[in-house]
Amino acid sequence: MELLQRTRKINKLLQEHKGIAVDFKEMADYLGSAMQSNVFILSRRGKLLGFGVNELLKNERIIKMLEERQFPETYVELLLNINETKSNIQIENDLSVFPSENADLFAQSNTVIIPIKGGGTRLGTLVLGRVDRAFDDEDLVLGEYAATVVGMEILREKHADIENLARDKAAINMAINSLSYSEKEAIEHIFDELGASEGLLVASKVADRVGITRSVIVNALRKLESAGVIESRSLGMKGTFIKIKKENFLEELSASH
């Protein structure tokens, strides 16, 4: 397959998603097929975002690593020291993606390390591995192009996460500001009582202990639930199950004093 055709297929992956995040597993599978290699797309900290492997499934340590979706910390540290593409790394090198304990099986293997960058920062690493053939210049061009595409997607996801956090913060603050003094006090006592982000609440017990009416607790919970901050479910005589939906709620509640 010519380089132009292979590059166009990566473009097609982007175009078909129409604003939805590109599936890194799909990207890795395509690269593995187009380049006839094992492919690993890693975050900066070594989390496995996507992979396409074949020969490496012969090794138990690799299988466990894929199941945990995390590369070893020592290997990730080595990757972060690589600031530009490093190609055709041999099995004897610590940067080889092939397991050294099976050096006899992978004696002719080659590894390529391609840093994934975006916005002036290191976002991750693209790792390629072949069992018995070196990578040529066309392979490296395609790999570097794929790394650029992955970097753009990681940045897009980061920006989306920031926007979601900002929306959640605004919703939380609006909900907190809608509470009366006694309702806010009731909510603080409720989560002190639970000692966690979810649990079973017996409103009458909290009301008696704190010295407020049960209706204050009920009203406070309704306001938070209508704002999408918590969810609650009545369990009859057992009480009410409460769960925080927006993870920064307790932090914002504490900061609102």
UniProtKB/Swiss-Prot annotation:
GO terms for cellular component: cytoplasm. Pfam families: CodY, HTH_CodY. The keyword DNA-binding applies. Residues 1-155 are annotated as: GAF domain. Signal peptide: none annotated. GO terms for molecular function: DNA binding; DNA-binding transcription factor activity; GTP binding. The keyword Membrane does not apply. It is found in: Cytoplasm. Residues 203-222 bind DNA. One of its GO terms (biological process) is negative regulation of DNA-templated transcription. Keywords: Cytoplasm, DNA-binding, Repressor, Transcription, Transcription regulation. Belongs to the CodY family. DNA-binding global transcriptional regulator which is involved in the adaptive response to starvation and acts by directly or indirectly controlling the expression of numerous genes in response to nutrient availability. During rapid exponential growth, CodY is highly active and represses genes whose products allow adaptation to nutrient depletion. This is Global transcriptional regulator CodY.
